UniProtKB/Swiss-Prot annotation:
Natural source organism: Cutibacterium acnes (strain DSM 16379 / KPA171202)
GO cellular component terms attached to this protein's record: cytosol
Binding positions for S-adenosyl-L-methionine per the UniProt entry: G113, L137, G138, D139, Y140, V141, L142
Protein name: tRNA (guanine-N(1)-)-methyltransferase
Any Gene Ontology biological process: tRNA N1-guanine methylation
């Protein structure tokens, strides 16, 4: 999988060299390239923004640098196997199922906007050439798309076969198929007693059936309490 990042702050992505993502790059599972959008400007000030058409506050990222960057990084031929992601608060919510879908992609290009956003013709052009995703991490606004791109990267790449040392650990995470889309149950480790708080007795019983039932019940309880939108009538709570 090749990952490209277009940003006016490419140093944001230096963190991809560390931890498991860095190991994945060393092992050849992923190939990471961060690009400075200003490299495709032609004026002394390396300008990437201009005032919005129709008036209004703030600045909008100009289409020209994006177009030239696309031509050089992706090419000028349509290719639906290339996934281009525009992080945006007006995008569709990013979910675990979206991460799973993207984990089989061969090429992902992240377009990280700043200021008030990117000229929409850039998105329209990209959609005419490649597979475009406008995605949001949640109902809040960030200063730019870099943080969102990093979060999406981690959610996607950890699902690539060979990335996780123990792939079974993916099956019991929140939102996973192994959890039926529920939130993960609470986790505990040793010592059994810590500052007056004990590990639930059932987890130390060695009784696998009781442990499985406790974990399932806790997953349902937490999901109903914190994310009722994820539940359905099977758990006694309307969707």
């Amino acid at each position: 999988m090749r990952l490209d990042y277009l940003s006016i702050f490419p140093a944001y992505f230096d963190v991809l060299d560390i931890s498991l993502l860095g190991k994945a790059a060393v092992n050849g599972l992923v190939e990471v390239h961060a690009h400075d959008l200003r490299d495709w400007t032609h004026d002394r000030h390396r300008t990437v923004d201009d005032t919005p058409c129709g008036g209004g506050a703030g600045m909008v990222m100009k289409p020209d640098p994006w177009g030239e960057a696309f031509d050089e990084i992706i090419g000028t031929e349509p290719d639906s196997s290339v996934h281009v992601i525009f992080p945006s608060p007006s995008g569709a919510p990013f979910t675990q199922s979206a991460a799973q879908e993207l984990s089989s992609a061969v090429r992902i290009v992240f377009c990280c906007g700043r200021y008030e956003g990117i000229d929409h013709r850039v998105i329209d052009y990209a959609r005419s050439m490649w597979t475009v995703h406008e995605v949001s991490l949640g109902d809040y606004v960030l200063n730019g798309g870099e943080v969102a791109a990093l979060a999406i990267t981690e959610a996607v790449v950890r699902l690539v076969p060979g990335f996780m040392g123990n792939p079974e650990s993916l099956a019991e995470e929140s939102f996973s198929a192994g959890q039926d889309g529920l939130l993960e149950y609470p986790l505990f480790t040793r010592p059994v007693s810590w500052r007056g708080l004990d590990v639930p007795e059932v987890l130390m019983s060695g009784h696998h059936g009781r442990i499985a039932k406790w974990r399932r019940d806790e997953s349902v309880r937490l999901t109903c309490e914190r994310r009722p939108d994820l539940t359905d009538s099977d758990f006694g709570v309307p969707h």
